Amino acid sequence: MISLPKQLVVIGDSSVYGWGDNEGGGWCERLRKDWGNNQNGPVIYQLGVRGDGIEKVSSRWEKEWSSRGETRRNKPKAILLNVGLNDTAAIGQINGRHQLDIDGFEYGLERLINEMNSQTNVFVIVLTPVDESKMPFAGCLWYSNDFCNSYERRMEEVCLNQNVPFLPTFRELYSDQRSKNWITNDGIHLNSKGHFWIFQRLKSWEILTKWKES
């Protein structure tokens, strides 16, 4: 019988898709290629959709995840979730209604992680800073670092409560002066240097490495 490699489904928004990284295709694609250097290493499925928030990911994750086991009875052994930035955006003005208010976001994330965690291993990578001087995005959406920080803290609480590994990225990036040059001109997406930084953090994330090698 042929032994299949493990599969890791990476699901989320444009960050997973790799938007902004014209050199390496994004942190997820960089990780896929890096892991692909080992013939027996896990296979990464990259399922990022631009504009997705917690509600859209919640509606599609199970079908997407379950259909990538490569054989009829097999299911991917883990999910890496990266979502939330789009939910933080205020509509119309800086103090406008959020795409999803923070309490609704926390509730939605709790449900989503609980569903995922009942079927497979779950890892969470959180948010990245924005360039507030470039707002509004698309003429109507206001992203701010205060919003990102608040939503990321809620994400951490949910992950801690459900014993799910999370990789905090916002505060580390925000405190790094170089990161101001790692955001594209639209103000919300990382450029190639930013994606490379995320890739390096994931590559050295001990708990993900242990899962990969187990």
Task: Give the residues covered by each predicted segment.
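Serine-esterase "nucleophile elbow" of acetyl-processing enzymes
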Residues: 1-50, 54-56, 62-75, 79
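Alpha-helical cap/lid subdomain in secreted, periplasmic
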Residues: 3, 40, 58-214
